[in-house]
């Protein structure tokens, strides 16, 4: 289908799709921020339980001492904030920074998934010692609470993993992966989405594209 020219530009008919892409990026970024906040909150609950249950700290030690709820949440909130910013104003710098930190967050989410899975596996073994503990009921209750919090954290981490992969893929489809080559050797403006000199900055490609800084 041949795009119609509007105001002397062939980019105008693509505006609606471009705005949809920006909206999707901002929504995914908001999910990342919410995930980070919830993971941090669950981590705080784990810390509180760990301090209350002096005799049953083995239920909490793995996630607590790895610090995943803290540094994982920081990465997720940061990547979400950059994604929202890049969705609102897709400059080259914001796009590259968002792409880079989302790749890092994908790695962090994968590592967090491993940590939390190991924690749940360890708790399964720790439950077997509850019957021989001084307070079996308290032991089982704390173990169940720990499992519940860690399971929620694991679900949020898996959601974060899927979101970061989706955002990274969107940036790659928007030519961010080859953006450095595009800067040194300007490609066809319609294919890459990088605006030709003198064109209106509002008329961008269907993918989340960079505006001239």
UniProtKB/Swiss-Prot annotation:
Q: Where is this region: Disordered?
A: 189-213
Membrane-crossing residue ranges in chain numbering: 27-47, 59-79, 98-118, 149-169
Residues in compartment: Cytoplasmic:
1-26, 80-97, 170-213
Q: What is known of its domains?
A: The C-terminal region is required for binding to CDKN3-CDK2 complexes and the modulation of CDKN3 activity.
| Record's keyword terms, sorted | Membrane, Receptor, Transmembrane, Transmembrane helix
Location comes to: Membrane
InterPro entries, sorted: CD20-like, MS4A
Give the record's family classification. Answer: Belongs to the MS4A family.
* Protein name as it appears in the record: Membrane-spanning 4-domains subfamily A member 3
Q: Residue spans with biased composition (Polar residues)?
A: 201-213
**Topological domains annotated Extracellular:** 48-58, 119-148
GO cellular component term, pick one: membrane
Q: Which gene encodes it?
A: Ms4a3
